[in-house]
Amino acid sequence: MEGWQRAFVLHSRPWSETSLMLDVFTEESGRVRLVAKGARSKRSNLKGALQPFTPLLLRYSGRGEVKTLRSAEAVSLALPLSGITLYSGLYINELLSRVLEYETRFSELFFDYLNCIQALAGTTGSPEPALRRFELALLGHLGYGVNFTHCAGSGERVDDTMTYRYREEKGFFASVVIDNNTFTGRHLKALEEREFPDVDTLRASKRFTRMALKPYLGGKPLKSRELFRQFMPKRTVKMKKD
């Protein structure tokens, strides 16, 4: 694609002595694999720009699976993610790299991604609400439509006080058994409205998105989750010392 378009680097790795292999998420072309020739050389002005969470304008060309980066400019400084928000950002980057096919346009998802990392950069509390909203948006763009407002068995509106069991590709059915696959009507309302007023609804939304994303991720664990688990004990110890 010869024209300029907005983009973010999801992941990069060394490619030859002076180049980088980039996995980027673009507004118009979706996920694209690019070679940035000479980007690792000492004289390259791209080195600082081709970092995750830096808003970019870029141009590339090529007809094969791997394109060639022609130009790239940082629109602004990288969004300030650190600590838990940095690990959260790495998680959504890895999520996109795992579930999106190359060169499939997801323009609306691009702005959902931008909104998510902006929310992470601006949060002073838990990153969980921003992550859950992004996961739900991603599922919607992947065609994973779920009706949170009506019981799939009876067609009636869900009741806040009742319990519902989730069945993949079918929806929620009233249930008298409570286990890890069931949700209250109150949980479903929170999922529908993308609002999580307490820890209980946040935990329920996390259970649901993990269940729903599992078919797309397969059995291979996410590296960012493991990094997050390693980070959390250190963070807990530091908070206790403080």
UniProtKB/Swiss-Prot annotation:
Lineage: Bacteria, Pseudomonadati, Pseudomonadota, Gammaproteobacteria, Enterobacterales
A GO CC term attached to the entry: bacterial nucleoid
SUPFAM superfamilies assigned: ArfGap/RecO-like zinc finger, Nucleic acid-binding proteins
A UniProt-annotated Pfam family: RecO_C
Protein name: DNA repair protein RecO
Keyword check for Translocase: no
Subunit structure: Monomer.
InterPro entries: ARFGAP/RecO (IPR037278), DNA_rep/recomb_RecO_N (IPR022572), NA-bd_OB-fold (IPR012340), RecO (IPR003717), RecO_C (IPR042242)
One GO term (biological process): double-strand break repair
Entry function: Involved in DNA repair and RecF pathway recombination.
Family recorded in the similarity comment: Belongs to the RecO family.
Swiss-Prot/TrEMBL keywords: DNA damage, DNA recombination, DNA repair
